[in-house]
Amino acid sequence: MNRKITFCIPSKNNLRYLKNSIQSIKENSLHQNEIIVYVDADNDGTKEWLDQNNIKYLVNDTDIPKGIAYGYNRCIEAAETPIVCMFHADMYMGQWFDDAILKHLKPLSVVSGTRIEPPLHPKGLEKIVEDFGMYPEDFKKAEFDKFVYEMRYVYQGKTTKGIFAPWAIYKEDITSIGMHDEKLHSYHEDSDIFNRFILNGYDIIQTWEALVYHLTCRGGQFQDGIEQVTKDEFFHLMKNSSFKNYVRKWGTFIKNDEYQYPTIPHKYNVGIHIKNCNKQILNIIEPWGT
């Protein structure tokens, strides 16, 4: 079997969404592709479901999540195809997404698809806002499929310069720059690697013929039936740790243009003189100053 792309999908207690995601890849791919799921500190039956459906997966059996960066890296290492695609468990792939990606992908390039999102977040020049449902149970599949079919002709040949999930790259190219920085856990790992792609001269392409419906992290960031974000203490610790590590590394905050193409400012260095400093004060000040 000559498989083209490995879809890498980290998932933590997202079985409800993951089922739809995997179904869409199987049904809507033009080519034979591979799927690898990284099951991260899971307790919702994902591993058992993957076993039953003969889906390749890797697993973190501990109670402590490793994070999306770690999950992506393990999937990339295990991929048996020359091309890997970073995919989210709450994405539903439109028809022939894979073929549209392959049409533009070449060595030393990164190709992103185009997200269609419900009106949960503001509009952006890099995405399409259309409401095809907020949850897997109310997903309007027939309407979405029709929309994708029509938009493939409307956007035929259209590309812009932006980068975000889902994105694809040659396995050799992402391996050569060290893959994702695992110190960034589950947050800002994408901005970090996008910056490194640009600094290494990779061509950044967004194709508007490769469409996905994105439930905007409903599975990971929202409890079922509750509209407000709910996070535990561990989440906030990981997020704050990742953000500080990003600033330590880049000396700046994350910046993108209107199409979500990263702009990399000059690294700043702020010196702060504190009298009678102690570890508690230093922990608050660092990494904002040195």
Regions flagged by a language model, labelled:
Residues K161-G178, K183-L211:
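A short, conserved alpha-helix in the catalytic core of glycosyltransferases
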Residues F147-I169:
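A recurrent flexible, glycine/aromatic-enriched loop bordering the glycosyltransferase active site
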Residues V84:
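Short aromatic/hydrophobic "clamp" motif used to bind/position activated sugar donors
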Residues Q23-Q32, P287-G289:
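Short, acidic, metal-binding catalytic loop of nucleotide-sugar glycosyltransferases
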Residues D61-A79:
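Glycine-rich, basic loop-to-helix element that forms the pyrophosphate-binding segment
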